A protein has these predicted regions:
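Flavin (FAD/FMN)-binding glycine-rich loop and adjacent Rossmann-like elements that form
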Residues: 1-10, 14-26, 30-169
């Protein structure tokens, strides 16, 4: 970002043509993390006022090969699709080491395919490239650990496979 006083005069972009300075008349910061605003010198508030803590990042993944009948039976038996009872049992045995107490999954259109939105990565700063890289590494490990627990303990996931993992937090 290049400024002329308090006005953004150019955005510096990098693409296949290299670095380019693009003149601006008006700028809408649609980065999602206030990148342009922060680089232009605007005051940016990040995280909670009292400690700066931000919402945990998550690394979603898709699994297929889920036995939906077995999964549905377990949900009806426990009257919960969050598997709280199972998570508490696994936490008591020391197998569930994650900092959250629920399992979140969403049925997708393909039979036996679910999106898992359960990972929670605390202390990831979405505005810092290094923090995002470390968070991505932690997230991939967490996906592997969570999926192994799912296959061992969650009804319907015994023969499931990881179909895809999100490319970004």
């Amino acid at each position: 970002v290049e400024c002329d006083g308090k006005r953004i005069s150019h955005l510096i972009l990098h693409n296949k043509s290299g670095l380019q300075a693009v003149p601006t008349r008006a700028v809408v910061d649609a980065t999602g993390d206030a990148d342009v605003a922060a680089r232009s010198g605007c005051e940016v508030v990040k995280g909670r006022p009292e400690d700066g803590l931000m919402t945990p990042a998550t690394l979603m993944f898709h699994v297929d090969g889920v036995d939906q009948d077995a999964l549905r039976d377990e949900i009806y038996r426990t009257e919960s699709n969050r598997f709280r009872e199972l998570v508490q049992k696994l936490r008591a045995t020391g197998e569930w080491t994650f900092p959250y107490d629920i399992f979140i999954s969403v049925q997708l259109t393909e039979k036996g395919t679910l999106m898992i939105n359960t990972t929670r990565l605390v202390d990831v700063d979405g505005t810092d490239g290094w923090s995002l890289s470390l968070g991505m590494m932690r997230g991939r490990r967490e996906v592997e650990e969570l999926f192994a627990l799912m296959q061992r303990h969650f009804p319907g996931f015994e023969k499931a496979r990881i179909k895809r993992v999100a490319p970004m937090l």
